[in-house]
Amino acid sequence: MKKLLFTLLFFPFAGNLNAQNAVESENGIYARFTTNKGIIVCQLEYQKTPMTVGNFVGLAEGDFKVGDKSFSKPFFDGLIFHRVIADFMIQGGDPQGTGMGDPGYKFYDEIDPTLKHIGPGILSMANSGPNTNGSQFFITHKATPWLDGKHTVFGHVISGQDVVNAIAQNDTMRKVEIIRVGREAIKWNAQAAFDQVYLAKKAQDELEQAELLKIAAMSQDDYKVFMYNEVKKNYPNAQQSATGLVYVILDNGKSNEVKEGKKVSLHYTGTLRRGGKKFDSSKDRNAPLEFEYKVQRMIPGFEEGITYIKEGGKIMLFIPYYNAYGKQGRPGSIPAYADLVFEIELLQVTDAAPHNEHDGHQH
């Protein structure tokens, strides 16, 4: 009797090992796609992208809930690869099979900088823009670095890349199985992993939306006072100009001043004041920004701010949204009502090369 009980307790684990066919030998969580062209096995990055893997695993196993949407049967079984582009990728996961379908909800991007579209076999989320993930995913035929930072990588092929390459449009995912190897992977709960990240992001999103409504209701004069007080909490020595620009001079510099028509060379790093997300940096490119002041125009707060230092100087600028990209922001990079923070090092200010009478007429 004891022997029978031992067998019953451990039989599911043994069956799991048989299903792996000796491919999934390392501890981890795997997705096994059985298609009409063969089998593809992907290792899932459940530790680096727990929300995204939680979504995928929950749908695949048919035991998942987001808001008022519940799933009680495997979601992907029987779906087609509705979009296949040669020498690029195969895409599936759409219940409609048209590229327009989703599971009835959308969730946030979960970009991990160590996970990139570095070669064939990268498993990544398809989307229609920032934070519009659902159930559609793709697997690459080759490196696609232009997708980095825009699509969430959450796994990679460990077996069956030849099958990926053989898949044609309308081929079928007959079955998608989730395989867990190791104690940690077996204990890992897809719903809990998803909820932990998703609900925190959702709560933060709701707070930000409430703050945006508050900001939208303020007059420009009221907002100047509000933003100045917010910045001074961390930078008590900050100053504010008549336009509402808040700045902290770190080094005044010693020589040439910024004037209209001068050639300016500077390094900058730009972040969002709310949340602190970096959106651009000349230092990341190892290439200073060079332009002719007030000839090649910048946002008003930037143009004003660099006049407060001289060549060799350093300054932090806190630019209110109305002197940056306004109420609408800049879709894809700058949110609505976004105040911008720039850390600037003014490298050089020189006379610009003389212009001829035809300059500026080619555009």
Q: Whereabouts are the PLM-identified features?
A:
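Bacterial Sec-dependent N-terminal signal peptides
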Residues: 1-25
